[in-house]
């Protein structure tokens, strides 16, 4: 299969990724100015959701509509995948009917197997390992507010989860230093750490991670599928709550990001999203525009670019 996919930040070169987030800024500006731009007219995106989502569905569906195309939502119950059809068989059929497929799933291997058997681009809308579309939005948001992130320091506070893994990949591709503050036993995937080398540092003190940082980011302490661990995680992660006082330790122009949904009073203080240093709402909106840039890159013929 010759289709180009987006399963990981490592699938593209640093220049390609930078081009995507810059294109996201341009497409956002087109939308603000009310200019019609429909390079994906008559194109159809299939969206397979094994994990539910608000932002992922809205951003991809609205993005396809804004670019002139359409999106079809499929829950796990709506396909034969939910009844035991092999992933490879589903991929071969769906990719004959669609122009691209976005999958939000649990096991990352579901994505890689689907992509290996697909004629059309496959996009990782989230897996247990990675969340690369969110990192496109995060990098676009930093670019809009502060310019290049190259050489900056980013602090990730909390669970070494899929978002943290994607931040590690972003540190490699966008050339910034990443400090990860997490409890022992909740570190990010060692394979990603090995790939990043000296770009990533694991610390146990969240204050040390935040000190002098240009960007601070976090996520929920208990992800989907981990509900039975909630009580234990709440106790272990309590010292890792990000607050306004936390941001006071960072650079004066620090930005705070959260991929949302946020649990106010848990991983963040109740008032943090309302702090002037928080750009979480811009970050959420930029899922739409960064993913439009990705869809255009993967699906639209080059001669249709504005």
UniProtKB/Swiss-Prot annotation:
Catalytic activity: carbamoyl phosphate + L-ornithine = L-citrulline + phosphate + H(+)
Keyword entries, A-Z: Amino-acid biosynthesis, Arginine biosynthesis, Cytoplasm, Transferase
Induction description: Negatively regulated by ArgR.
Keyword Thylakoid appears in the UniProt entry: no
pH profile of the protein: Optimum pH is between 8.5 and 9.5.
The EC number(s) this enzyme carries: 2.1.3.3
SUPFAM superfamilies reported for this sequence: Aspartate/ornithine carbamoyltransferase
Residues that coordinate or bind carbamoyl phosphate: 53-56, 80, 104, 131-134, 259-260, 287
Subcellular locations according to the entry: Cytoplasm
Mechanisms controlling activity: Reversibly inhibited by inhibited by phaseolotoxin and octicidine.
Top EC category: transferase
GO terms (BP aspect): arginine biosynthetic process via ornithine; citrulline biosynthetic process; L-arginine biosynthetic process
Pathway, per record: Amino-acid biosynthesis; L-arginine biosynthesis; L-arginine from L-ornithine and carbamoyl phosphate: step 1/3
This protein's record includes keyword Ion transport: no
Binding sites annotated in the UniProt record for L-ornithine: 162, 219, 223-224
GO CC term, one of those recorded: cytoplasm
One annotated GO molecular function: ornithine carbamoyltransferase activity
Chief place where the protein resides: cytoplasm
Role description: Reversibly catalyzes the transfer of the carbamoyl group from carbamoyl phosphate (CP) to the N(epsilon) atom of ornithine (ORN) to produce L-citrulline, which is a substrate for argininosuccinate synthetase, the enzyme involved in the final step in arginine biosynthesis.
Quaternary structure note: Homotrimer.
Family: Belongs to the aspartate/ornithine carbamoyltransferase superfamily. OTCase family.
Protein name: Ornithine carbamoyltransferase 1, anabolic
Gene source species: Pseudomonas savastanoi pv. phaseolicola
